[in-house]
A protein has these predicted regions:
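M16 family metallopeptidases and their MPP-like homologs
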Residues: 1-23, 29-78, 90, 94-96, ...
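Short, flexible, solvent-exposed loop/turn segments with mixed acidic/basic and small polar residues
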Residues: 44-47, 142-149, 259-262, 360-364
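Short, conserved charged micro-motifs
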Residues: 66-67, 164-168, 223-224, 278-283, ...
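Non-catalytic, conformational "gating/processing" segments within enzyme and secreted inhibitor domains
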Residues: 138-174, 193, 369-370
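Glycine-rich, charged/polar anion/phosphate-binding loops
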Residues: 140-143, 185-187, 195-201, 216-217, ...
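Acidic, glycine-rich loop-and-beta core segments that form the ion-binding/anion-interacting portion
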Residues: 168-172, 180, 206, 213-214
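Bilobed periplasmic-binding protein-like "clamshell/Venus-flytrap" ligand-binding domains
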Residues: 358-374
């Protein structure tokens, strides 16, 4: 139970900072010795803190598994959380946030999050904010990580060259090494969305301008997950309606697309375009035009059929990859869904009906309180 949604306001961004520190040394091995040992075993270890989850992944050749597993146990059970490594990673995060503030795309999305979600954790996103970062300490990062280790909310998964008996044995061994905590982690209150439209203009010394329009969306961990995947597939890529409208028909953007956000709690549906200052206002109008079209008419039969096929193909490919299937299965269980969802997902997507999809998503796409952002080089009359 980690990730942004489980952070308190004063700890925004701490999940990502803790994730960076897990592979920066253990109680027994320095960072250099740990990385050397993993490299000698041909291992790849990644720790990812997202909006709704905290995921530790490790892969290696079977012949090196025993030695790598010993190091993995140290990483998850006895990470060092050294002060020097913390200071380094905090400095890296500080530079990341400063870089985001100067990027039209990142700055626009970060401001949109704040306006859309307010004080809910989704409002500060996975990176957190600079004021939140400055309040974080090494002790807080360590306590946050260890407080996540709740047995009934932790999921272990194994895949590849192993038997079920071996997987059970490794699970028991890893569980025995964990410094478990007993207090169950609970979700915060759901976000309260704006009662009216919100807008912002962010001047930045860049040549390009990012424009976006966003409306409240469904919880992506829920029953609308497959429908949102099809909508996402439809509105991204060179054949998407928004690309054809904004770029091909009006030559107003370098790139366009749709972003989805959410998970345990409702998130957003966001349409964006990267354009120039002179065409930013018109590009934003066209994004709103596309949103209203989707709200009124939904995806056309051609758009729907193509998008559903693309989403189903991606699901089939994911089920064929051990790593991707294992990752998807763990997240499915994390959200309280079925163990075999990854292997049923292609069929679930193909079973989605166009009229049902359009009817289900219309209330979100027609929401009366969009958030609209313009960031980068602005039209002359635009001010913050």
């Amino acid at each position: 139970p980690g990730g942004t949604i489980f952070e308190r306001p004063e700890l925004g961004g701490i999940s990502g900072l803790a994730a960076d520190l897990l592979t920066a040394g253990t109680k027994r091995h320095s960072e250099s010795a740990l990385l050397t040992g993993l490299d000698a075993g041909g291992a790849s270890v990644s720790v990812n803190a997202g909006l709704n989850s905290f995921l530790i992944e490790c892969s290696c050749p079977r012949r090196h598994f025993a030695r790598v597993f010993r190091l993995l146990k140290e990483i998850v059970a006895t990470p060092a959380f050294g002060q020097a490594e913390f200071d380094r990673e905090k400095a890296n995060r500080r530079e990341l946030l400063k870089s985001r503030a100067m990027s039209p795309r990142a700055a626009a999305e970060d401001r949109a999050r704040m306006l859309m979600f307010g004080g809910h954790p989704y409002g500060w996103g996975a990176a957190g904010t600079l004021p939140q970062l400055e309040g974080l300490t090494c002790e807080l990062a360590a306590e946050y990580y260890f407080s996540r280790l709740v047995p009934e909310q932790t999921i272990f998964g194994w895949g590849g060259d192993c038997t079920e008996a071996e997987a059970r044995e490794w699970t028991e061994e890893l569980a025995a090494a964990m410094p478990w905590r007993g207090e169950r982690i609970t979700l915060p209150e759901q976000p309260v969305f704006p009662s009216g439209p919100r807008t912002a203009a962010i001047p930045l010394p860049r040549e390009q301008t990012m424009v976006l329009t966003a409306v409240p969306g469904p919880a992506l961990g829920g029953e609308l997950y497959s429908m949102c995947e099809i909508l996402f597939q439809a509105e991204n890529g060179l054949a998407s309606p928004v690309f054809k409208l904004v770029r091909e028909e009006h030559s107003l953007a370098y790139s366009t697309g749709m972003r989805l956000s959410g998970g345990f709690h409702p998130g957003w549906l966001l349409l964006y375009a990267v354009t120039a200052a002179e065409t930013a206002e018109r590009a934003l109008e066209l994004l709103e035009q596309e949103r209203r079209r989707l709200a009124a008419n939904g995806l056309s039969p051609e758009e729907f059929n193509s998008a559903r096929e693309g989403a189903a193909f991606a699901a089939a490919r994911a089920a064929e990859s051990v790593g991707t299937a294992l990752n998807s299965t763990l997240l499915s269980l994390h959200y309280g869904r079925g163990l075999d969802e990854c292997f049923r997902h292609e069929a679930e997507l193909r079973a989605v009906d166009r009229e049902a999809l359009n009817a289900a998503l219309t209330p979100y796409l027609s929401h009366p309180s969009p958030v609209q952002i313009m960031a980068g080089r602005l039209p002359n009359r635009k001010e913050v």
